[in-house]
Structures are given as structure tokens and as C-alpha cells.
């Protein structure tokens, strides 16, 4: 049902593109959904060369951070994305120092919002210790020129928010943005997409 509808919308929008400088952007909830939709578009006989499809993290990484990281002081000398295994290892080690209250890697969840990155742990008694752990964790990442998944979203928003030229450049090459599973979109993802859409005065079409 829903995937099929999205596939047909993508195929239709691709068939209408007249310039090879414009792209149809489709944002999916998972990488496997992206692969499936791309395959279906090809089965319909439509060339996916002007389709960019992937998750919001992939979108931010490949279309915002990598092309424009020079605009950010802490990213301009390059960066890599830390994997979840290494993140877990670092946080588990850092948590060992805290016994009262005892904290673990599972308490270290965070969520990126437009103004900051926040702890998601519901036990407020653990927050003072967790704040210290996360400060040390982000310090280690900075020393290693690494960023994690939530920072991908936060830094992408910061770049768009501080540099109108980036939103304008992106909006000119995006003819259409389609978003799958829109109800699962976080606030910061909504901000990122909205900023790009606004920069083109509503000329970039969007389907959700």
C-alpha cells in the first residue's frame, strides 16, 4: 500500500525532471526501505540516476555535512562518524566511575533538538552523573575528530540555521522532497527539512 504509493510518486516526479541539475529526494525510516523503493522504481522502468533516497541521517551526512563542513569550526578539519559499537564501548567505560547512583550505557540516551542535545533518561537523579559522562564522551569524540548520530542532526541544523546560502543551494537542486513514515519524524528533522523548503519560497514540492 504505502510503499507502492510512494514508489509511484517518486517515479512520476522523476519522469517530470527536465534538468540533470535537479534531484528528487526521498527520506525513509530505514536503509532497507530505501533499497526496496529504489529497486521498485527501477522495475517501473524509471532511471533512478536523479533520485537520492536514504534515511534522515544519511541525507544530513551526505548532502549537508560532507559538502559544507568547512563552514563549522569543529568540523572543518574533517570528521568521521563513530559506530554504535564504539560509542557503547566508550560510554560503558566512562560509566564505571559512577557508583551512587550507579549508571550504565543504557542510561546514556540522548536526543538532538534544534537548541541542544538532551538526555532522555527518565531518572532525574542520574542526570548530574550522566551530564559529566556525556561531556567526557563528546570530548573524546572531538579529540578523535568523530561525531555520533545525534550530532549529525544537530550539526546539520546548525549549518542550515547559521548559513542561509546552504539552504538556498540545496533547495535549488531539490525539485521534490518525499518523506516516508512522517509521523516518526523528530522535531529537529522537521526543522531541517522546513528550512530547506522555505529557502526556495515554496518552489520545492513536498509529499509526506
Feature annotation, model-predicted:
Residues 1-71:
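P-loop NTPase Walker
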Residues 2, 186-208:
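Conserved helicase motor core of SF1/SF2 NTP-dependent helicases
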Residues 2-5, 23-25, 95-178, 187-192:
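Accessory N-terminal region flanking or inserted into the helicase ATPase core
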Residues 9, 36-41, 59-63, 90-94, ...:
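Alpha-helical scaffold elements adjacent to nucleotide-binding pockets in ATP/GTP-utilizing enzyme cores
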Residues 16-19, 45-46, 169-170, 198-203:
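Conserved catalytic network of the ASCE P-loop NTPase/AAA+ motor domain
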Residues 51, 176-177, 206-208:
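Hydrophobic "anchor" residues on beta-strands that sit immediately upstream
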Residues 67-87, 97-102:
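DNA-processing P-loop NTPase/helicase core
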Residues 181:
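Walker B catalytic acidic pair
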Amino acid at each position: 500500500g504505502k510503499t507502492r504509493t510512494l514508489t509511484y510518486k517518486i517515479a512520476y516526479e522523476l519522469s517530470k525532471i527536465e534538468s540533470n541539475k535537479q534531484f528528487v529526494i526521498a527520506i525513509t525510516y530505514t536503509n532497507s526501505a530505501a533499497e526496496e523503493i529504489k529497486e521498485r522504481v527501477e522495475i517501473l522502468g524509471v532511471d533512478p540516476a536523479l533520485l537520492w533516497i536514504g534515511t534522515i541521517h544519511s541525507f544530513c551526512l551526505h548532502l549537508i555535512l560532507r559538502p559544507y563542513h568547512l563552514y563549522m569550526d569543529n568540523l572543518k578539519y574533517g570528521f568521521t562518524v563513530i559506530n554504535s559499537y564504539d560509542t557503547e564501548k566508550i560510554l560503558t567505560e566512562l560509566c564505571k566511575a559512577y557508583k551512587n547512583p550507579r549508571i550504565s550505557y543504557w542510561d546514556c540516551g540522548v536526543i538532538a533538538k534544534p537548541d541542544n542535545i538532551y538526555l532522555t533518561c527518565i531518572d532525574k537523579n542520574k542526570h548530574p552523573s550522566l551530564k559529566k559522562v556525556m561531556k567526557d564522551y563528546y570530548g573524546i569524540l572531538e579529540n578523535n575528530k568523530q561525531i555520533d548520530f545525534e550530532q549529525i542532526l544537530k550539526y546539520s541544523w546548525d549549518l542550515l540555521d547559521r548559513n542561509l546560502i546552504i539552504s538556498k543551494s540545496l533547495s535549488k537542486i531539490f525539485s521534490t522532497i518525499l518523506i516516508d513514515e512522517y509521523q516518526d519524524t523528530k522535531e529537529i528533522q522537521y526543522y531541517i527539512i522546513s528550512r530547506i523548503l522555505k529557502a526556495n519560497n515554496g518552489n520545492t514540492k513536498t509529499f509526506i
